[in-house]
């Protein structure tokens, strides 16, 4: 699948927002266990009103028109999915957002899914920041188990790990909104 590009002005503004609000320098241990001299707290962009608009503008430029839902593993996917779905609605596009719990609930509405994902949905799987892609691919597995089809893997930021190769191996289009070199 060929994905459309993000408008240059939107991409530049999103990168500038991330650099100003989300990038930190220092000595950090990443979720992957790797050490890094920089860290992206991308929720500082994904949860900021201006950041949401920039993120959603970029995302809606690359999410296939036939996608019907957006979501991923909580907590990383939540602000991305909810923000993109809300902005999509203001533009006349319907994308249902959902989240996948890390563990199934044993009370109320049980299971790992929270939100209106349906069998047959064509899904954009998202995450705020990714290095190895384990959370994204856990979400892919759950979405498939629920009878929906992942059509795009779209992290807000790709730090440059193994996610692109894993997506290619799984046969799913991959388009981060921003990469570390950006």
Question: Predicted regions: what is each one?
Answer:
Residues 80-124, 131-137:
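Short, glycine/charge-rich flexible loops or terminal/linker lids adjacent to PRPP-binding catalytic cores
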Residues 32, 63, 115-119, 145-146, ...:
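Solvent-exposed alpha-helices and their adjacent loops that cap or buttress functional pockets
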Residues 66-76, 152-154:
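Short glycine-rich phosphate-binding loop at a beta-alpha junction
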Residues 70-71, 98, 151, 175:
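Structural detector of well-ordered beta-strand residues that form the stable sheet scaffold
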Residues 1-63:
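Active-site-facing substrate-recognition patch
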Residues 2-17, 140-182:
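PRPP-dependent phosphoribosyltransferase catalytic core
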Residues 59-68, 144:
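Phosphate/pyrophosphate-binding loops at sites that engage ATP/ADP/AMP, CoA/4′-phosphopantetheine
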């Amino acid at each position: 699948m060929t994905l459309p590009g993000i408008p240059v002005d939107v991409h530049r503004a999103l990168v500038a927002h991330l650099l100003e609000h989300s990038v930190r320098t220092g000595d950090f241990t990443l979720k992957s266990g790797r050490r890094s001299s920089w860290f992206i707290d991308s929720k500082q962009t994904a949860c900021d009103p201006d950041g949401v608009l920039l993120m959603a503008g970029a995302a809606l430029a690359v999410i296939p028109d036939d996608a019907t839902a957006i979501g991923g593993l909580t907590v990383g996917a939540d602000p991305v999915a909810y923000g993109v779905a809300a902005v999509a609605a203001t533009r006349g596009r319907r994308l249902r957002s959902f989240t996948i719990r890390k563990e199934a609930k044993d009370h109320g509405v049980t299971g790992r899914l929270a939100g209106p994902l349906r069998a047959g949905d064509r899904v954009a799987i998202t995450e705020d920041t990714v290095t190895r892609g384990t959370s994204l691919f856990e979400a892919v597995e759950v979405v498939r188990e629920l009878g929906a089809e992942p059509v795009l893997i779209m992290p807000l930021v790709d730090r440059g790990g193994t996610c692109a190769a894993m997506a290619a191996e799984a046969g799913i289009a991959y388009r981060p909104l921003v990469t570390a070199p950006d």
